[in-house]
């Protein structure tokens, strides 16, 4: 075990073993809502390789059949840990398969709500859960009780809705308590973690700050220095502030102005980070370099790669100018990785298919021989926002809408020129300004304007015009995996469109995108 304590060694941890369910991450989120630290690992995790002992284990659902030849299976060593275990859906079927192969294909798939009937009213898992609505989503079923188990809950269509081992705290449930459709599902998960596993409810961002600051100091040491890229977004700002709290001016933040940032972004970020938060920041104006490299490029993937490669080149060049006080080279690179990024990479079947190339600084590690430091890698976005406010970062910045790494370059459809960027930038500024004036900014998850690669006939004064088209986008979402368009009042859209056409030269028409995700993505490119 490392001498530097990890989060799962400091806080009581519920281990969630992922069998591939689309709901698996929700188990972790629900437990954290009760201030219980939960961590997800692939179901194939070797228990001998764990560097911590969990207080309990939850086996998630999954899209497979336990009896299939290529079905994933858990390391049987989890049963030697001596901690409570809860199998959900596929996880329950895994328990049944291990203990007598009591699983078969159902006559029909059961998907939707069911009413839970608890037989053992004294069982701690089902305290305050009886006769509630639960959510079913399974095609296989138990055709008999696993060896050593008894039934403790049923539903109209499932005689084995809940089972428990006769002498051990090993539970199986056929439904999904982690989804909101299960009315008392969160209560059941809390019962498991608190009443059965006796996990302490001390996972708070206030406690995390002290733990993480000390961990950073132990990791970096008394003299080493750290560099990191900042964008003005919440993730990089919170990570930078946390690093500054830990090691002061031995952290060097670099903001690369790539020419496709929001209006007045570089100046705003500098004022916020340096004057407001005391972060050691260098601003690099590389707009010409980026825009020159983007000349003639229309393919969105090529844009992303050009911006990513140019960023690495500029960042490396600026980092070489930093001379650490101890005379040694920079050792560490800060990155604002969040827990959803970690979750996406842990699947035993491999990460999900790439839809878009993500703009990050991964290439810097290999090129500059840096060690990666990720202080936010255990946190969900809502936890990062809470952490940011505790660190004294303004509400406005903490709740700022996401902005893509490639910036306005992927909001100018087609070739990116200085003129096109300026049109999109000004239109976006007007749009966001009006959203704020209307008191809607915090109700909307993300909003932006993009410039379409088409022209449209218009009339300005007595003159016929033939100019460009702006598309407005605004969405509501909880996780950015799915999203719906925001239903503005027509009067609001009329006002925004009027301002853009009258105040931004080169625009003849404004449209509003009413496509949900899926089928569309949030960004146009």
UniProtKB/Swiss-Prot annotation:
Signal peptide: none annotated. One of its GO terms (molecular function) is GMP synthase (glutamine-hydrolyzing) activity. PROSITE patterns: GATASE_TYPE_1, GMPS_ATP_PPASE. It comes from the Eukaryota. ATP binds at residues 231-237. SUPFAM superfamilies: Adenine nucleotide alpha hydrolases-like (SSF52402), Class I glutamine amidotransferase-like (SSF52317), GMP synthetase C-terminal dimerisation domain (SSF54810). Residues 13-202 form the Glutamine amidotransferase type-1 domain. The keyword Chaperone does not apply. InterPro entries: Class_I_gatase-like, GATASE, GMP_synth_C, GMP_synth_GATase, GMP_synthase, GMPS_ATP_PPase_dom, NAD/GMP_synthase, Rossmann-like_a/b/a_fold. Pathway: Purine metabolism; GMP biosynthesis; GMP from XMP (L-Gln route): step 1/1. The active site is at residues 89, 176, 178. It is found in: Cytoplasm, Cytosol. GO terms for cellular component: cytosol. Its EC number is 6.3.5.2. It catalyses: XMP + L-glutamine + ATP + H2O = GMP + L-glutamate + AMP + diphosphate + 2 H(+). Its cofactor is Mg(2+). XMP binds at residues 304, 462, 517, 523. Its main location: cytoplasm. Residues 203-400 form the GMPS ATP-PPase domain. Keywords: ATP-binding, Cytoplasm, Glutamine amidotransferase, GMP biosynthesis, Ligase, Magnesium, Nucleotide-binding, Purine biosynthesis. One of its GO terms (biological process) is GMP biosynthetic process. CDD domains: GATase1_GMP_Synthase (cd01742), GMP_synthase_C (cd01997). Homodimer. PANTHER family: GMP SYNTHASE [GLUTAMINE-HYDROLYZING], GMP SYNTHASE-RELATED. Catalyzes the conversion of xanthine monophosphate (XMP) to GMP in the presence of glutamine and ATP through an adenyl-XMP intermediate. This is GMP synthase [glutamine-hydrolyzing].
